[in-house]
A protein has these predicted regions:
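Active-site beta->alpha loop and helix N-cap motifs at the rims of alpha/beta catalytic domains
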Residues: 35-125, 146
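Hydrophobic faces of well-ordered beta-strands that scaffold small-molecule active sites
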Residues: 12-18, 58-61, 81-87, 112-114, ...
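Glycine-enriched alpha-helix->loop->beta-strand junction motifs that scaffold or abut catalytic
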Residues: 77-80, 106-110, 140, 161-169, ...
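Surface-exposed cleft-lining segments at the edges of enzyme active sites
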Residues: 116-127, 139-145, 182-188
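Active-site-adjacent beta->alpha loops and helix N-cap segments on the catalytic face
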Residues: 63-79, 92-98, 118-136, 153-158, ...
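Glycine-rich phosphate-binding active-site loops on the catalytic face of alpha/beta enzymes
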Residues: 116-118, 167-178, 233-249
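Histidine/lysine/aspartate-rich catalytic loop segments that bind and position anionic ligands
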Residues: 159-190, 201
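Structured C-terminal cap/extension of enzyme domains
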Residues: 4-6, 10-13, 31, 42-49, ...
């Protein structure tokens, strides 16, 4: 599998995301409960191990006690997957992200980025000082790669024009409005083709490496279509993050690696 240079980190072209591990199914309560029941601590560790065996060397996952515990145990048991830490706020604790950044660096994160809902909310609220503070804090902790996720093209345009980051993590879809709250909304999510096209247009204008995510609309859109769009959009030093629910298919990791190699490994496009 191809590799990309993200800041000072070398990252596999396909990476694994943590939403299924934490029950963020984007497919309703029954599906969420199914993921939570399947992904015990041991099953998550086995999935990370299988990812490494398939050539995936990086995990994009939350900063919370659950994931901290799993990663600590996984690394203590000999695992070596890199972790790009997703920095979140909490309900009633809008400033706690600073603690999670520090905790992630202390635990051993390779990279860190602000959660897409937080980024959407900060940008919509005009809280641009938070972006500058986040960059300064992450840089001070000597993380190898720092960036921001987001579902809104205009937020990514502002980041592109105003911040020095190592990557921008661009969601192909914008399932819910985060202008009033940064937190996850499980009901009424929307997966519109026009949102995907707007983000693809934005991606083409970004010169730093892009992490393409939600390419399958949280499992709500066809897999091959997602990989075809990715293959057309991905630039030479871009990567992709995909959450995988092995409860559906124990071979999902190797199948996704094969599809990524088929559609993306031959891509040698210069940055726009």
């Amino acid at each position: 599998m191809r590799k990309a240079q993200i800041g000072n980190a070398t990252v596999s072209g396909l990476t694994i995301g943590g939403n299924p591990f934490s029950g963020f199914s984007h497919q309703g309560k029954e599906r969420t409960d199914e993921m939570l029941a399947f992904y015990t601590d041991d099953q998550i560790k086995a999935t990370l191990r299988a990812s490494e065996e398939a050539g995936i060397d990086t995990f994009f996952g939350r900063t919370d006690d659950h994931i901290f515990r799993i990663l600590r145990g996984y690394w203590d048991g000999g695992g070596s997957i890199q972790w790009f830490a997703q920095i979140c706020t909490e309900r009633g604790k809008p400033d706690v992200w600073r603690d999670w950044v520090k905790g992630a660096a202390e635990l051993g994160a390779t990279g860190a980025y602000l959660h897409g809902g937080v980024v959407d909310n900060w940008h919509a609220s005009g809280e641009h000082d938070n972006f500058h503070e986040a960059v300064a804090l992450m840089r001070s902790l000597e993380l190898k790669a720092i960036g921001f996720a987001g579902h809104k093209p205009d937020a990514h345009g502002w980041i592109r024009d105003n911040l020095e980051v190592d990557f921008q993590m661009c969601s192909y879809y914008n399932p819910s409005d985060r202008s009033k709250s940064a937190h996850h909304v499980s009901e009424g999510e929307k997966w519109h083709e026009e949102d995907r096209q707007l983000m693809l247009d934005m991606i083409s204008s970004i010169t730093t490496p892009v992490v393409h995510y939600k390419i399958f609309a949280g499992g709500n859109r066809p897999i091959i279509d997602g990989f075809e769009k990715l293959g057309n959009a991905i630039k030479e030093n871009d990567i992709c993050c995909v959450g995988m629910f092995l409860g559906d298919d124990p071979e999902m990791i190797t199948k996704n690696v094969s599809l990524f190699e088929q559609y993306c490994d031959t891509v040698e496009k210069p940055v726009a």
